[in-house]
């Protein structure tokens, strides 16, 4: 089965198996396939895919990198480029990224820059990669722990999503992807939330496939309105402004999803402080939805997970100054929630600049609660 979920802003296919020759039908055997993955997936998932490609007449090469966010560096990026150069890979070859968000971010950036661009196919193997990282063409690497400081917009030729590959993952890893599902529900499509009410239901393939499909459609719908991230696409940054600042400070000691979960809670508190959010019930609902999947909802939760001494308010404010959205203001603009399923719009803009005083007040209240509860 190959189901076309959408073809805008690029084709996204839901498949029941990656061992389907029809997936390769649009590719020419005149040029090689270059797979980029990590060392674990190279042994776990890739062999049958490589065998199929070879049986169809393709020349195949595999490049592997270590697992983890710490791999997402300039050194890794240049090493992959050097390997492509050593192999004398032509720009007509197709680069296929197989893995989670880290792999797809790096592989997409390599594809965008090798010989000024080569075809790229994403095969996401985690939930967050299936519903978020593989969609929309954003790619890049970190610089000195600053998230995605160097990167580009480069749409993939296709995304192939096989929900069955999630069976390789522990339950906790699946829950990490739920954070992005919840984000989509709160900024654009509240109809996603009923699919998240029973965590056990997601153990069923049909329920999980439906969740993936709805989230793919949600993100694709937002992206196709604003591929270059100048307007509507900015709502996808909900939770990520503070979340990325926290990731920078924690230096790999917390998963991306945990930072984003707390980021969403804090940015909803900002929305309430500014009178943008229509009801405190939005915050209560968000917290319950996150807790259902054992995701953190406070700074205290993060520090308990990371087992490191707390930072202070000034350190978080300083980390925020490196945000990519920052303009000629002390702080970057923030996405605000108006109601569940609706990100706020400010005269056609979807991010709001706030005063340092208001953010400091929200953060100080959070630190006070951490030290006194």
UniProtKB/Swiss-Prot annotation:
UniProt feature coiled coil, ranges: none
Gene Ontology cellular-component annotations: cytoplasm
Keyword field: Amino-acid biosynthesis, Aromatic amino acid biosynthesis, Cobalt, Cytoplasm, Lyase, Metal-binding, NAD, Nucleotide-binding, Zinc
The protein's enzyme class: lyase
Cofactor binding annotation: Binds 1 divalent metal cation per subunit. Can use either Co(2+) or Zn(2+).
Top-rank lineage group of the source organism: Bacteria
Catalysed conversion reaction: 7-phospho-2-dehydro-3-deoxy-D-arabino-heptonate = 3-dehydroquinate + phosphate
Pfam families recorded: DHQ_synthase, DHQS_C
One BP annotation, GO: amino acid biosynthetic process
UniProt xrefs under InterPro entries: Dehydroquinate_synthase, DHQ_synth_AroB, DHQ_synth_fam, DHQS/DOIS_N, DHQS_C
Paired cysteines (S-S): none
GO molecular function, one term: metal ion binding
EC number: 4.2.3.4
CC cofactor: NAD(+); Co(2+); Zn(2+)
Pathway linked to the protein: Metabolic intermediate biosynthesis; chorismate biosynthesis; chorismate from D-erythrose 4-phosphate and phosphoenolpyruvate: step 2/7
Residue numbers binding Zn(2+): 180, 240, 256
Subcellular location(s) of the protein: Cytoplasm
Residue positions binding NAD(+): 67-72, 101-105, 125-126, 138, 147
S-adenosyl-L-methionine in keyword set: no
Alphabetical list of NCBIfam families matching this protein: aroB
Protein family according to the UniProt entry: Belongs to the sugar phosphate cyclases superfamily. Dehydroquinate synthase family.
Role according to the record: Catalyzes the conversion of 3-deoxy-D-arabino-heptulosonate 7-phosphate (DAHP) to dehydroquinate (DHQ).
Protein name from the UniProt record: 3-dehydroquinate synthase
Organism annotation: Chlamydia trachomatis serovar D (strain ATCC VR-885 / DSM 19411 / UW-3/Cx)
Lineage: Bacteria, Pseudomonadati, Chlamydiota, Chlamydiia, Chlamydiales
């Amino acid at each position: 089965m190959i189901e076309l979920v959408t073809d805008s802003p690029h084709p996204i296919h839901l498949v029941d198996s990656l061992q389907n020759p029809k997936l390769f039908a649009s590719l020419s055997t005149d040029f090689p396939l270059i797979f980029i993955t990590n060392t674990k997936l190279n042994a776990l998932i890739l062999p049958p895919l490589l065998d199929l490609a070879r049986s169809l007449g393709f020349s195949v090469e595999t490049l592997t990198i270590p697992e983890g966010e710490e791999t997402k560096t300039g050194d890794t990026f240049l090493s992959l480029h050097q390997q492509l150069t050593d192999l004398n890979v032509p720009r007509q070859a197709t680069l296929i990224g197989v893995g989670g968000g880290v792999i797809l971010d790096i592989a997409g950036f390599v594809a965008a820059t090798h010989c000024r661009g080569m075809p790229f196919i994403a095969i996401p193997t985690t939930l967050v990669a299936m519903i978020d990282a593989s969609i929309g063409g954003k790619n890049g690497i970190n610089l000195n722990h600053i998230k995605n400081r160097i990167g580009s917009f480069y749409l993939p030729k296709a995304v192939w999503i096989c929900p069955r590959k999630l069976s390789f993952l522990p339950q906790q890893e699946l829950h990490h992807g739920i954070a992005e599902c919840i984000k989509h529900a709160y900024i654009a499509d509240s109809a996603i939330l009923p699919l998240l009410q029973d965590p056990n239901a997601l153990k069923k393939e049909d329920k999980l496939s439906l969740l993936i499909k709805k989230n793919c459609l949600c993100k694709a719908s937002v992206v196709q309105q604003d591929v270059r991230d100048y307007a509507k696409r900015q709502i996808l940054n909900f939770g990520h402004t503070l979340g990325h600042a926290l990731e920078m400070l924690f230096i790999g000691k917390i998963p991306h999803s945990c930072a984003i979960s707390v980021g969403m809670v804090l940015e909803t508190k900002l929305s309430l402080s500014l009178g943008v959010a229509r009801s405190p019930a939005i915050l209560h609902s968000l917290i319950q939805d996150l807790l259902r999947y054992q995701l953190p909802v406070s700074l205290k939760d993060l520090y308990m997970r990371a087992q490191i001494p707390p930072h202070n308010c000034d350190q978080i404010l300083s980390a925020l100054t490196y945000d990519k959205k920052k303009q000629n203001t002390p702080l970057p603009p923030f996405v605000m929630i108006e109601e569940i399923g609706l990100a706020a719009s400010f005269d056609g803009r979807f991010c709001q600049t706030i005063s340092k005083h208001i953010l400091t007040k929200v953060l100080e209240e959070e630190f006070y609660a951490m030290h006194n509860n």
